[in-house]
Each structure stands twice: as structure tokens, then as C-alpha cells.
Amino acid sequence: MVHVIDGDTIIVKYNGKSETIRLLCVDTPESVHPDKRRNVSMGIVASNYTKKRLLGKQVLLELLPFNGRRGRHLAYVFVDGQNFNVELVKQGLSPYYTKYGISKYDTEFRKAEKRR
């Protein structure tokens, strides 16, 4: 793990390069948006949680075979054997985001939403 941009976007070393990864099926509140009015305190909480859980740790990426509309890799991130994307939902830091379709981990995400 190299750097946390915000609650749902990280930078990792991948194939010898720093690559931006957008976490799938989550959408945390804004914390580093260029329009400062869009940044909210829960976005900072989500960003700090992601830093606490991922910085300095080895993560496993389950990448989609294509990039997102902003050119970022799209992935499920696993840390300590757990799906971190689902964890963000379970912690109440993101909804289960299905704008682009349901997840292969749909059951886990739906259970996580109910635990909030």
C-alpha cells in the first residue's frame, strides 16, 4: 500500500508502478474534492479509516479487466483476508454502490448494509 487519496481511492505499487485504484461498489463522501464545498466531515472520517486499515499493509487486489471512466483501475481490495470494500459498507462509511451494476459479492454487501 502506498497512498490513500480518499475513502474509496488508493494508490498501490502494481507491476513496478504506482497505480490508482478505485474501490468497486463503494462511494464514500468527498474529502479531497477540488471544490472544497463538496468535502464533508464524514468523507474525512472515511479517508482516515481507509488510511488506518490499509497504509503499510500488503493488500490483495481483485481487478476488473478494464479501467473506469477516469482511467483508474477498478478493484476489490482485500486486507487481512477481508474484503475491504464490504468493510467500508459494514462500518457505515459508504452505501453499497450499485450504479454500474451489482457486485459478485452482492450477498456480502447486502448483509453489511443490514448491520449498519
Regions found by a protein language model. Name each.
Residues 1-116:
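Small beta-barrel nucleic-acid-binding modules, primarily SNase/OB-fold domains
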